């Protein structure tokens, strides 16, 4: 056994040396022969905790058994790993090639990913198309304002193309000057309150604000809290205003309530907005009367939107100037608190219209017909006939047209008046399905109650030219029954305008 032991030990040492030489880690070289090296190995074995070596440190049998089992395990493990080593050796060149080709594969992978991304872009764009369409539909408010301004420009051009425009312009120049002088507040009329606090100026509504219905207007009535004193306040207010303004108790009550609103900031702006809506209300009431005549209404709808836009805004300003005049006088003198000033007519700084109303014996003209001419139809001709002259400050300022007659086209194809004379004095607005047509809560015409005859349209006519007529929102006084004043500009004066228009739905819902 000892011989075998030494042989195995020598083989083990030689094998270890060869393996170490291949791995570039040579073992320590002994200067003695193989036995010396074997002894060195054997002496180190007892120090290990091997099985059977605890009983005797020099027990060679135990040492041999331990070495044999150790070597057997090593051989078995080596044999088991030989196939794996062979496979690794075979696949090593392939692995080297794979490493060399790895950059190319990465490049191909990157190109493939890029191609997939480029293919997916059209799909993403297709998905985003509806969002872009929705964004395009949301037009900014500035663009809408520009469109409304363009409507106003087109309206002016459209009216300028009509053949009767020159005649209408010449017939209304003097009347417009008189209207402005008579109704617009000025510095001379501001006695108690500074003129800067008055409400004045022209207004214009956008086309969108004209597209409202007729069903949201309730009748205006005298408020319950004003019923006891309305006669006194209305009488004092009527004395302060010109007779031709024909202030009604309902209008007096509404102006009275406006000044009682608890508004500390921007009261002037809010009051102006309310006056504009009141004026628009009167225009819409007139249009509702026009709608009753189907033939005339169909002709009105055929007018282009720009022309109707200009007509409605002109009528709006006529009503608005009257409301402004009444508001400024009521707010300045407060007849509900102070009554009538004792110096009315005696003070040189008092309103010229007030002095005229007290001292002048000249008949006052109707507020929406402040013109000194009227249309007289004879046969197929409509001529301007001279009427009485109207003075505003003594006999210095006159507002009358020259006596020269202006001939117009034949009225054979003229339309009937848009608002026919009413036979009864009660023309109140129905109160069923009452809804407010306006957004602002301060502009609501409340409190309103049914049964008030606030709209009277006797002998009132509407001009499609819109340059000098309006809807009259009250009854004409009996003093003028014998000398009925007709509107100076009627539909009969514009036959060619109706011929040149195109069909369309017009302003909705009109």
Curated annotation (Swiss-Prot):
An annotated GO cellular component: extracellular region
Keyword terms of this UniProt record: Glycoprotein, Host nucleus, Secreted, Signal, Virulence
Coiled-coil regions listed in the entry: none
Residue stretches of biased makeup (Basic and acidic residues): 429-442
Region annotated Disordered, chain positions: 111-139, 386-442
Bias-annotated ranges (Basic residues): 122-137
Positions with biased composition (Polar residues): 393-405
Signal peptide positions (record): 1-20
Carbohydrate-modified residues: 47
Residue window of motif RxLR-dEER: 48-65
Compartments, as annotated in UniProt: Secreted; Host nucleus
Lineage top rank: taxon: Eukaryota
Function: Secreted effector that completely suppresses the host cell death induced by cell death-inducing proteins.
Domain comment quoted from the record: The RxLR-dEER motif acts to carry the protein into the host cell cytoplasm through binding to cell surface phosphatidylinositol-3-phosphate.
Family label: Belongs to the RxLR effector family.
Protein name: Secreted RxLR effector protein 108
Species for this entry: Plasmopara viticola (Downy mildew of grapevine)
Lineage, uppermost ranks: Eukaryota, Sar, Stramenopiles, Oomycota, Peronosporales
Gene name as annotated: RXLR108
């Amino acid at each position: 056994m000892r011989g075998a032991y030494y042989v195995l030990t020598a083989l083990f040492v030689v094998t270890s040396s060869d393996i170490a030489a291949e791995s570039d880690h040579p073992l320590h070289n002994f200067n003695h022969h193989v036995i010396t090296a074997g002894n060195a190995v054997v002496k180190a074995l007892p120090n290990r905790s091997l099985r059977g070596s605890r009983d005797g440190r020099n027990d060679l049998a135990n040492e041999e058994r331990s070495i044999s089992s150790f070597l057997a395990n090593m051989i078995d493990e080596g044999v088991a790993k030989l196939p794996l080593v062979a496979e690794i050796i075979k696949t090593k060149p392939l692995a080297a090639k794979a490493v060399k080709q790895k950059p190319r594969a990465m490049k191909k992978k990157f190109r493939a990913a890029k191609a997939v991304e480029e293919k997916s872009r059209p799909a993403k764009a297709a998905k985003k198309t509806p969002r872009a369409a929705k964004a395009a539909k949301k037009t900014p408010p500035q663009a809408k304002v520009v469109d409304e301004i363009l409507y106003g420009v087109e309206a002016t051009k459209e009216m300028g193309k009509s053949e009767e425009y020159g005649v209408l312009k010449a017939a209304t120049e003097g009347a417009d000057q008189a209207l402005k002088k008579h109704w617009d507040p000025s510095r001379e009329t501001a006695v108690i309150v500074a003129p800067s606090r008055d409400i004045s100026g022209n207004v214009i509504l956008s086309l969108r604000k004209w597209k409202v219905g007729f069903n949201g207007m309730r009748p205006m009535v005298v408020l319950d809290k004003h019923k006891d004193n309305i006669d006194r306040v209305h009488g004092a207010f009527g004395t302060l205003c010109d007779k031709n303004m024909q202030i009604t108790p309902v209008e007096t009550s509404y102006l009275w309530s406006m000044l009682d609103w608890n508004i500390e900031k921007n009261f002037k702006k809010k009051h102006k907005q309310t006056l504009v809506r009141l004026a628009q209300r009167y225009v819409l009431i007139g249009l509702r009367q026009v709608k009753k005549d189907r033939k005339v209404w169909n002709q009105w709808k055929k007018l282009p939107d720009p022309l109707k836009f200009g007509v409605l805004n002109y009528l709006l300003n006529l009503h608005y100037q009257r409301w402004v005049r009444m508001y400024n006088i009521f707010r300045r003198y407060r007849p509900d608190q102070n009554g009538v000033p004792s110096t009315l007519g005696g003070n040189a700084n008092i309103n010229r219209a007030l002095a005229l109303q007290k001292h002048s014996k000249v008949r006052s003209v109707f507020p929406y017909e402040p013109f000194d001419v009227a249309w007289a139809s004879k046969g197929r001709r409509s001529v301007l006939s001279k009427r009485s002259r109207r003075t505003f400050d003594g006999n210095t300022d006159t507002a009358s047209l020259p006596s020269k007659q202006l001939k117009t086209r034949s009225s054979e194809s003229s339309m009937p008046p848009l608002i026919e004379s009413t036979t009864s004095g009660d023309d109140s607005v129905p109160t069923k399905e009452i809804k407010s047509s306006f957004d602002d809560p301060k502009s609501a015409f409340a409190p309103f109650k049914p049964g008030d005859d606030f709209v009277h349209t006797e002998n009132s006519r509407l001009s499609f030219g819109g340059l000098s007529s309006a809807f009259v929102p009250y009854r004409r006084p009996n003093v003028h029954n014998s000398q009925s004043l007709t509107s100076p500009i009627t539909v009969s004066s514009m036959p060619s305008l109706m011929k040149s228009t195109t069909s369309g739905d017009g302003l909705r819902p009109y």
